[in-house]
């Protein structure tokens, strides 16, 4: 169980199998070469959105992870927490990604997405360097 202090209250979050099943079914893609077969990939998309700083994705991830926990935090309370000047939003993103990196159910996919994003970033930087060198 993971916790964040939200509106002066410790709120629990569970990034286990229930979380994984729920978030995965939010986004599905067709499986290449297989007619009428789809694969649930919601966690992959959500991790990528978190890495991009998508605040809506952050609220969705926290809301799903709090399902079945006590106390249950509402989306309205999460919105208030995110909007508060006292909230360090970068820290909330870091902690949430940290939870996803360490929970057994989400660790491998999260680390894989982070690795892929880093590879793409390095490719883009290399292309930019090549363009700059070609222009010089």
Language-model features, listed with the residues they occupy:
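Short capping micro-motif at the N-terminus of alpha-helices
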Residues: 13-15
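Charged interaction scaffolds used for protein-protein
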Residues: 1-10, 31-48, 56, 68-136
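Active-site- and interface-proximal helix/loop "cap" or "latch" segments in soluble metabolic
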Residues: 26, 50-55
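Generic hydrophobic, helix-prone segments enriched in Leu/Val/Ile
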Residues: 19, 47-51
């Amino acid at each position: 169980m993971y916790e964040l202090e939200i509106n002066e209250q410790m709120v629990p979050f569970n990034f286990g199998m229930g979380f994984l099943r729920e978030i995965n079914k939010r986004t599905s893609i067709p499986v290449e070469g297989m007619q009428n077969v789809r694969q649930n990939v919601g966690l992959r998309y959500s991790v990528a959105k978190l890495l991009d700083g998508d605040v809506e994705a952050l609220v969705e991830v926290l809301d799903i992870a709090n399902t079945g926990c006590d106390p249950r935090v509402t989306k309205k309370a999460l919105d208030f927490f995110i909007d508060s000047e006292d909230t360090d939003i970068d820290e909330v993103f870091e902690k949430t990604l940290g939870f996803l990196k360490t929970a057994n159910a989400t660790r491998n996919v999260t680390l894989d997405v982070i690795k892929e994003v880093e590879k793409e970033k390095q490719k883009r930087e290399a292309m930019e360097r090549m363009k700059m060198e070609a222009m010089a």
